[in-house]
Regions:
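Non-catalytic signal-transmission and effector/linker regions of two-component phosphorelay proteins
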Residues: 1-11, 17-18, 24, 39, ...
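Short amphipathic alpha-helix used as the core "switch/output" element in two-component signaling
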Residues: 67-78
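Acidic catalytic/metal-coordinating carboxylates
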Residues: 38-39, 65-68
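The feature encodes the CheY-like receiver
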Residues: 62, 90
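Acidic, metal-coordinating helix/loop segments flanking the phosphotransfer/catalytic sites
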Residues: 36-54
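A Lys-centered signature of the CheY-like receiver
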Residues: 108
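Active-site residues of response regulator receiver
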Residues: 58, 86
Length: 125
């Protein structure tokens, strides 16, 4: 039986193509393998849940929201460290996300280094 390496993939879920591409490029520029999805449902339908080490997810998405995705993954016993990003810094939503296990909640626009520090911390989980 082969020993499985710890997953290192950073999955990015954001419906804004510019944000998605920028975050994907940022992750790859520092050596993190990354894959971007436009919708939560696209990520769920992919075969990448098991090798995802960190999720960067927009709170507000068409269809399933970022919080709904977090809830579904928790219900399916996936424990993927999740960093939420949003243009709407609602404290109630922030607390809900953190109580459900999010490792960070960043309000757009955010500093690239703040996001990278959060990703590095998530990969250490």
């Amino acid at each position: 039986m082969a020993i499985r390496e710890k997953p290192q993939l950073v999955a990015i879920i954001d419906d804004n193509e510019l944000v998605r591409n920028a975050l994907n490029g940022l992750m790859k520029s520092v050596g993190f393998p990354a894959l971007a999805f436009a919708h939560a449902e696209d990520f769920l339908a992919s075969d990448r849940k098991d090798d995802t080490a960190c999720l960067i997810v927009d709170i507000r998405l068409p269809g399933m929201s970022g919080l709904e995705l977090q809830s579904k993954l928790n219900a399916e016993r996936y424990r993927i460290p999740t960093i939420f990003i949003t243009a709407h810094g609602d404290e109630t939503v922030r607390m809900q996300a953190l109580r459900a296990g999010a490792v960070e909640f960043l309000t757009k626009p955010f500093d690239d280094e703040a996001l990278l520090q959060s990703v590095r911390a998530a990969l250490e989980c």
